[in-house]
């Protein structure tokens, strides 16, 4: 698998979740922020990152930088969907991803929807099973998308001619 250069792609970012974290110290509470960000070019490349900082914009910037280092390629077939059904796991979170016919749209919960839209999937069904924490859902959706192989890749692996 070759390295993906994020500078060659026209990436857009979506903030999935921002959380305020409190550290209790002697004088009171110190607040910092973490931002879960998904980036994608809308044509098969997608990545996620978690940024942490004392200010929200800085946390988002760090999340985008990390997401660019964590890009994967998603095989998209005709009808702008995935080739077959897959189940992604992360911790207690599971995401079932199914291909859909043209015109269906993205039917997915908030965190998973951001991943699919950033990847450029326009017709896909998904269901979050188990944990619906945004961090677990995004990582489980990524696990599912990582498992996908294009039909050509599967045929080559099986030694079948096109």
Curated annotation (Swiss-Prot):
Keyword Ribosomal protein listed? The answer is yes
rRNA-binding in keyword set? yes
Record Gene3D superfamilies: 3.30.160.20, 3.30.230.10
GO CC, sorted alphabetically, is: small ribosomal subunit
InterPro entries on file: Ribosomal_Su5_D2-typ_SF (IPR020568), Ribosomal_uS5 (IPR000851), Ribosomal_uS5_bac-type (IPR005712), Ribosomal_uS5_C (IPR005324), Ribosomal_uS5_N (IPR013810), Ribosomal_uS5_N_CS (IPR018192), Ribsml_uS5_D2-typ_fold_subgr (IPR014721)
Task: Output the Gene Ontology terms for molecular function.
Answer: rRNA binding; structural constituent of ribosome
GO terms of biological process kind: translation
Domain S5 DRBM, residue spans: 11-74
Its domain comment says:
The N-terminal domain interacts with the head of the 30S subunit; the C-terminal domain interacts with the body and contacts protein S4. The interaction surface between S4 and S5 is involved in control of translational fidelity.
What is the annotated role of this protein in its UniProt record?
With S4 and S12 plays an important role in translational accuracy.
Q: How does it assemble?
A: Part of the 30S ribosomal subunit. Contacts proteins S4 and S8.
Q: What is the protein's given name?
A: Small ribosomal subunit protein uS5
- Name the source organism: Geobacter metallireducens (strain ATCC 53774 / DSM 7210 / GS-15)
